[in-house]
Amino acid sequence: MTIIEERATDTGMATVPLPAEGEIGLVHIGALTLENGTVLPDVTIAVQRWGELAPDRGNVVMVLHALTGDSHVTGPAGDGHPTAGWWDGVAGPGAPIDTDHWCAIATNVLGGCRGSTGPGSLAPDGKPWGSRFPQITIRDQVAADRAALAALGITEVAAVVGGSMGGARALEWLVTHPDDVRAGLVLAVGARATADQIGTQSTQVAAIKADPDWQGGDYHGTGRAPTEGMEIARRFAHLTYRGEEELDDRFANTPQDDEDPLTGGRYAVQSYLEYQGGKLARRFDPGTYVVLSDALSSHDVGRGRGGVEAALRSCPVPVVVGGITSDRLYPIRLQQELAELLPGCQGLDVVDSIYGHDGFLVETELVGKLIRRTLELAQR
């Protein structure tokens, strides 16, 4: 896979064009001042796009990934992409984001591990950032994305769309920069992190840090990584991503194959969760998991803005808000609050799904309708 590096100039304009469709571009945005005042130097953001950029650059749709996603929204696995697109089929000719008309752009979020600057990246001293990587927020992620777009000569977007952490990013974008976006889709998220979410995320972080191979966060390059802690964190997280009824319908209390839980064997659901944990641990950096989990726990669109209600009511942008009926991580009451307080929302769209929080990824036909409606709003 070709990787094109793009470096911001003092004028903020692009020195090279967007990468070829589906290819990764590395955009160097320079130093970024974070919300807590820390200056993160030499920041790089990985970018992919699908569809052609219009001459007036007015057809950009930002697709924002969740916790363990990346810039690879759609397409097969391959070099640089250990898995197929995480929202495969959402962008392309005739797709909800119709690339015959729109230019879909996705980044790997700040703090990520698929080309963007994160804990596994090299700091200016040539050593991995590791434990020295600063705490970041959702607001910082949006600032980095916008800086990457500015480096490519894009200062406004037609729409931002995302679910879960991507939904938090979309919401921050809409509230912080309402003059630079025409519409938004906010899925399966709330206005701020809840106590339950913070508890869930901090427990996952604790599992990773309890692994002796965490090494205080400085395990990169040592030949050892906190894989076991990462797997446990993912097993716990996956339970919050799926619907309770769906899991019971699939597994109930059935033993795994020929194993007997009464003599030390596993239940089928244990095997399933172990598989999910191992799958993520093979492709995702534990340090990034910690940094992004902490960013999610910091999510609060009302911080510094007079609270959630004041922040949401200040946003005039047309917004589609969607929630999943069986979501137990971001229950539908959280999206109801968004729908009631955002002036540009015409009411909550409910996706009836058994798949829990992951419904925003699984129910592509239903979610696709929400994407199409969002882009209709962007054309008004």
From Swiss-Prot:
Catalytic residues, chain numbering: S164, D327, H357
Q: What GO cellular component is one of the record's annotations?
A: cytoplasm
- Could you tell me the superkingdom of the organism this chain comes from? Bacteria
A GO term for molecular function: homoserine O-acetyltransferase activity
Q: Which GO terms describe its biological process?
A: homoserine metabolic process; methionine biosynthetic process
The record's annotation in Gene3D superfamilies points to: alpha/beta hydrolase
Q: Which Pfam families match?
A: Abhydrolase_1
- Spell out the subcellular localization from the entry: Cytoplasm
Q: Which reaction does it catalyse?
A: L-homoserine + acetyl-CoA = O-acetyl-L-homoserine + CoA
Give all residue intervals belonging to the AB hydrolase-1 domain.
59-363
Pathway(s) served:
Amino-acid biosynthesis; L-methionine biosynthesis via de novo pathway; O-acetyl-L-homoserine from L-homoserine: step 1/1
Q: What is its EC number?
A: 2.3.1.31
Which positions in this protein are listed as binding substrate?
R234, D358
Q: Which InterPro entries match?
A: AB_hydrolase_1 (IPR000073), AB_hydrolase_fold (IPR029058), HAT_MetX-like (IPR008220)
Provide the alphabetized UniProt keywords: Acyltransferase, Amino-acid biosynthesis, Cytoplasm, Methionine biosynthesis, Transferase
Q: Which family does it belong to?
A: Belongs to the AB hydrolase superfamily. MetX family.
Q: Quaternary structure per UniProt?
A: Homodimer.
Q: What does this protein do?
A: Transfers an acetyl group from acetyl-CoA to L-homoserine, forming acetyl-L-homoserine.
The protein depicted here goes by the name: Homoserine O-acetyltransferase
Q: What is the lineage of its organism?
A: Bacteria, Bacillati, Actinomycetota, Actinomycetes, Mycobacteriales
Gene that encodes the chain:
metXA
